[in-house]
Amino acid sequence: MTQYTPMIQQYLKVKADYQDAFLFFRLGDFYEMFFEDAVKAAHELEITLTSRDGGSSERIPMCGVPYHAAKNYIEQLVEKGYKVAVCEQVEDPKTAKGVVRREVVQLITPGTMMEGRTIDEKENNFLAALTHFEDGSYALACNDLTTGQNTVTLLTGSVEDILLEVYATGSKEIVVDSSFSKDELNKLTETLKMTISYEDATAIPEGLEHLVKNVSQAKLIKAVGRLFNYVIRTQKRSLDHLQPVEIYYTNQFMKIDVHSKRNLELTETLRTKEKTGSLLWLLDKTKTAMGGRMLKQWMERPLIQKERIEERLEMVETFVNDYFLREDLKEKLKEVYDLERLAGKVAFGNVNARDLLQLRRSLLQVPAILEAISLLDNAYAARLIQGADPCESLTELLGRSIQENPPLSIKDGDIIKDGYNDKLDQYRYVSKNGKTWIAELEKRERDITGIKSLKIGYNRIFGYYIEVTKANLGALPEGRYERKQTLANAERFITDELKEKETLILEAEEKIVQLEYDLFTALREEVKVFIPKLQHLAKVISELDVLQSFATVSEEEQFVKPVLTTKREIFIKDGRHPVVEKVLNGKLYVPNDCIMPENMDVFLITGPNMSGKSTYMRQLALVTVMSQIGCFVPATEAVLPVFDQIFTRIGAADDLISGQSTFMVEMLEAKNAIANASERSLILFDEIGRGTSTYDGMALAQAIIEHIHDQIGAKTLFSTHYHELTVLEDSLDQLKNVHVSAIEENGKVVFLHKIQDGAADKSYGIHVAQLAELPDSLIARAKEVLAQLEGQEEIVIPKRVEVKEQEVIPEPVVVKEEPVAIEETKVDNKEESQLSFFGTEQSSKKQDKPVLDVKETAVLTQIKKIDLLDMTPLEAMNELYRLQKKLKKG
């Protein structure tokens, strides 16, 4: 290192402590980067890569960005998952001896960003910390630095379960200890796409002990300690806005794994990954940013306590029934600023005068909001606003201190109102009246000298001066004026009186700006005292905002209040898929009932492709989620149990499990449901078994249905194209066949989208292909093949018969029994050549035909119908195996 210049040595010394971050090294008006940082940053930011002499034999790669534009460049890097260490000059270069002292003042990471394009106002920006213990358990702590919110929970289960809970937090960055295995880290980085950071310290930092007063479990404290130590190490500033840690337990909320959340499109759509088109998009009628964040949190964790759900529903009902109360509340909420994030800005010291003005305007709405809610005859409402302080003294303080239209910068003055500070008023009087005095002096000097063109001006070099044209110099009295500057056509002078006033005026203006800055920073410190009250107020207002949002959307979309029951029954009359109905935008939507009494656990759903089976299944799940977050539901009547979990297998393969086939993903998600579901769960399986051969798929589907029916007892919707499975209704007493109806008119299929009792008779797949405008020749060929297949052998479904208690053996049951016609026709040359593919010698027409029994003749007939050109090699092998197996049977 000694071969480098002192400045580069300083850079390398600082960089050594921030190896995993870009180091923005302040040099004058630029942040510079060197060596590998420069090469990588130039590529990522698309800026010029240059070089400089650093004292060694080779020039050092270098790139830089202007300090006033650095924020944008930092955001770009953090958006891509990088960290940025900001190294500032911490002493005046003019007074520095040797190299100017520099220090890292902040480490900006994906999980600690306070503002920027990546921070959605209606989403939290959580930083997660995961701690692994020897007994296999984990503790997960999360912090949103923008709001000060802190949570912690204890997790048990498989690594996959832990990762899914981490994923559910939406964290972009996770803090672990240095002993984490490479396998675990790979899952975090590759599967969850998170930035990894390290922190080994787990003791609660000094000064933050009060935040964990309600946390007694050592494991949870360690996780929180790791989180807090990392935040302190990276932020290097006040954290007065951090809120007490909230403990949550995953068994206190409905469990919806990340696959199911995505399949149901709760907060984002599967296709675009955007909010628009999701359930959150439909339900979000919130008027505040903090209300929007709370709504998303509620949707991530629906309640399972019946009493708490009913409390919310009653408040929503109150708002639905009182239009004027709801509309008045909405108007007031529109004026409420993001109190949570403002508290964070106050604590961090980056709040400006406009922010405080917005705070005052927000607080002006609070007394009326609290009063209106206090008048409600509702215990939940009374408990909600209990302890909420409208902070009227803060409102008054901000009202008499901040100007109505302050500038963005707090260093430009014109922030503080007149009358707030006596000294400031005096300076302003001098500044204002000093300029008036200058104007009066100019008039007086003109009168004394008789020079009408005499004027008093100002510039930064000479200050105030009296300017007289050369033609009028003879009119000046001797000894009164001191020459200051000579111009081509004029002379500039000063007087003792002018110099004295100049000093007063300029000092006053400088002192005004500095004093206003000092007064504002002092005011900011006073506001800090109110942070806990503001945060409590924010929670109250957020909750009211979510409840009015539910009421607003419920009235607009004609939702109904669900009745919660302790029985295991579902009664939904005229249920609708809320998002599909909204997207149809007034077009006719076909509602459907879902009636499953206590003795009915499984709906086996058959019906045409594109008829609405998946929509019907999602509809039930969304109605359930809406009910358990406290919202009305899309139906004319709804009686629902409280479900503990929702499991779904709907749609295409989930990219979270990268590299797996659709069938493997189906099996993994089926396993998850089978292993974890209870009789209080809801299971939605769409076309399980489609990713393998027909027989394998059908066998697996039947086995899964039977297991759910016999062993779990969960309410289940199971859609299938295996119509042969509908005979299970005869052997499974808590299973019912339902189908989505369709009719044929003039050779075309019309989907009625109506759920009816009984099994469907057709899938109408070819009709769907016609709708997709596949070639006519292909459609015609498909119809030929379908006719051939429908004439083939019957499919036998194993029926269970009771032999003794809890012992079941299969007994074949014929689903479709149509005798296969035994053809006596001659085999032509073409057919002979096809048979030779299976090892049979070509026969001459003159030779005698072999004598075949009935079974062999039936197989021969089926072979004749096979078109190998329309089959893949694998399909051909499967067909050969099936026919061979048929021949071997006795």
From Swiss-Prot:
Transmembrane segments: none
Keywords: ATP-binding, DNA damage, DNA repair, DNA-binding, Nucleotide-binding
Binding site for ATP: G607, P608, N609, M610, S611, G612, K613, S614
GO biological process: mismatch repair
Listed InterPro entries: DNA_mismatch_repair_MutS, DNA_mismatch_repair_MutS-lik_N, DNA_mismatch_repair_MutS/MSH, DNA_mismatch_repair_MutS_C, DNA_mismatch_repair_MutS_clamp, DNA_mismatch_repair_MutS_core, DNA_mismatch_repair_MutS_N, DNA_mismatch_repair_MutS_sf
Function, in words: This protein is involved in the repair of mismatches in DNA. It is possible that it carries out the mismatch recognition step. This protein has a weak ATPase activity.
HAMAP family (alphabetical): MutS
Family per record: Belongs to the DNA mismatch repair MutS family.
Protein name from the UniProt record: DNA mismatch repair protein MutS
Organism: Bacillus thuringiensis subsp. konkukian (strain 97-27)
Gene: mutS
